[in-house]
């Protein structure tokens, strides 16, 4: 564009001169002018070419600078990793995740690489997809938790034995934050497995992402239908009786974009056991977990909704205590008893109303409660709705916090009004108190977990990264100034809770 502009200016300037020459010399002078114009045009073209060449050189230099910056970043990350490793005196493994500079978000997962090192040796390497997870924790906690999928090089799901766990593709890195003992989830999952109820396997790791040390994490299995997790049949069109995994919860992650009609359905009963009316302000929502909301077929929805409806109708009926006509026809009572005791021993403030899973196998499979999930604000680590007190029943949440947005289903108060169910609780409590639920056994677990973290320096490095000892983090009831303080509070709370339950269970 500039070349044409210059050419026109020159022509306009020279045309008057052409009109002044004599006819005799006209041809010679016109030829001379043409040569001058050609020379000027050549110069202008050369200038433009020079500019293009210069711009190309600038682009090349910019790319070189970008490459050098990436190399510098990689070296800095390596130095950080080296510094972190030199500060470690740990027999526990360390996970290193590299996203190539991409930011980890909540949906969709981004591609990354994962290495597990132990004693500075790489023992595993995987391609992964990674995203943020959790609802409340994402909003309130600086230390994030992550959902992982192990992938092949094309980005497709790949089952692997991550960390020595049974082969699967879906994993979670839980970052304890408000729980400053770092063990509440691990403790209750261990107790569940110890009494024969599957809960996610757990292992402590340290985590570094893109060269930044993130502290102590727990590698966990995501709740899924799998022979090594929730061992139920895959539902199909030939047999729609199971298996199913359902949950009672609020929406999180991608589920926030869906209505309850897409994700699940609402109970016909309110939390107090009355049939809902248009004026009912409180409701219980059942969400599809397996098959999930995107995959479940209409006939499968109809089947499992009707099964839950029949169970609730039987439980709400006058014949609910009858072995044949009542609720026992639909549920595995022993699993309900164990689920109840695990939630009560920890006084989980979310018990029965959030992160509450239950499942049904095919054919004549009944409804089973579990696996348990998300206990980081249990064992006295909640300052609302009496979650901090070691006395009181968790299942009576509705009487304490009736205005809360998510209440406990009527199931539990109704079950606890049946002498048969109460008898099963007393029997199981008495059995477990001599074994896995004995005060000595539970406190030994607490001490073993603490020693594991302490001897490997994980408290020191975690709280150097997250300097929150002595600081209130929602929803702390107790704020200890040290790890010793936090564990003293936990041990005292557990002993008080067990003593209260001994008396309370006997009086059911």
Task: Map each language-model feature to its residues.
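Middle-to-C-terminal accessory/interaction subdomains
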Residues: 92-93, 103, 126-127, 135-137, ...
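Short, well-structured beta-strand/strand-turn elements
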Residues: 195-206, 348
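Short, solvent-exposed loop/turn and secondary-structure capping segments
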Residues: 107-108, 159-162, 184-185, 217-219, ...
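Bacterial N-terminal signal peptides that target proteins for export
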Residues: 1-10
């Amino acid at each position: 564009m500039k070349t044409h502009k210059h050419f026109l200016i020159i022509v306009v300037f020279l045309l008057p001169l052409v009109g002044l020459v004599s006819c005799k010399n006209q041809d010679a002078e016109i030829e001379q002018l043409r040569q001058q114009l050609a020379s000027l045009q050549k110069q202008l073209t050369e200038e433009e070419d020079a500019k293009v060449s210069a711009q190309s050189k600038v682009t090349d230099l910019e790319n070189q600078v970008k490459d050098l910056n990436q190399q510098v970043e990689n070296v800095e990350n390596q130095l950080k990793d080296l510094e972190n490793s030199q500060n470690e005196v740990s027999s526990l493994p360390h996970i290193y995740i590299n996203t190539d500079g991409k930011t980890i978000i909540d949906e969709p997962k981004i591609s990354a690489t994962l290495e597990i090192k132990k004693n500075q040796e790489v023992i595993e390497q995987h391609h992964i997809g990674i995203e943020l997870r959790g609802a409340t924790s994402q909003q309130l906690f600086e230390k994030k938790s992550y959902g992982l999928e192990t992938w092949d090089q094309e980005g497709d799901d790949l089952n692997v034995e991550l960390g020595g766990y049974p082969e699967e593709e879906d994993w979670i890195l839980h970052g304890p934050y408000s729980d400053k003992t770092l063990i509440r989830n691990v403790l209750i999952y261990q107790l569940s497995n110890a009494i024969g109820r599957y809960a996610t396997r757990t292992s402590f790791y340290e985590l570094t992402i893109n060269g930044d040390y993130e502290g102590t994490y727990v590698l966990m299995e995501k709740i899924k239908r799998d022979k090594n997790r929730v061992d139920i049949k895959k539902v199909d069109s030939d047999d729609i009786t199971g298996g199913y995994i359902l949950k009672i919860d609020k929406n999180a992650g991608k589920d926030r974009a869906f209505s309850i009609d897409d994700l699940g359905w609402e109970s016909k009963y309110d939390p107090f056991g009355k049939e809902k009316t248009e004026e009912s302000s409180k409701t219980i929502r059942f969400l599809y977990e397996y098959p999930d909301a995107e995959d479940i077929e209409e006939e499968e929805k109809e089947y499992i909704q009707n099964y839950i409806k029949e169970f609730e109708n039987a439980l709400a009926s006058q014949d609910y205590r009858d072995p044949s006509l009542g609720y026992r026809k639909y549920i595995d009572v022993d699993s309900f008893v164990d689920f109840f005791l695990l939630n009560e021993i920890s006084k989980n403030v979310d018990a029965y109303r959030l992160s509450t899973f239950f499942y049904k196998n095919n054919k004549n499979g009944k409804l089973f409660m579990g696996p348990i999930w998300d206990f980081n604000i249990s064992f006295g680590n909640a300052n609302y709705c009496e979650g901090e007190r070691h006395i009181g029943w968790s299942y009576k949440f509705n009487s304490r916090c009736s205005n809360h947005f998510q209440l406990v289903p009527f199931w539990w108060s109704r079950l606890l009004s049946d002498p048969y169910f109460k008898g099963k609780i007393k029997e199981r409590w008495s059995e477990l108190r001599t074994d896995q639920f004995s005060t000595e056994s539970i406190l030994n677990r607490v001490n073993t977990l603490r020693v594991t973290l302490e001897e490997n320096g994980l408290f020191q490095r975690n709280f150097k990264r997250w300097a929150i000892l002595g600081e209130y983090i929602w929803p702390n009831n107790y704020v200890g100034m040290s790890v010793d303080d936090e564990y003293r509070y936990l041990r005292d709370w557990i002993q008080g809770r067990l003593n209260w339950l001994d008396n309370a269970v006997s009086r059911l």
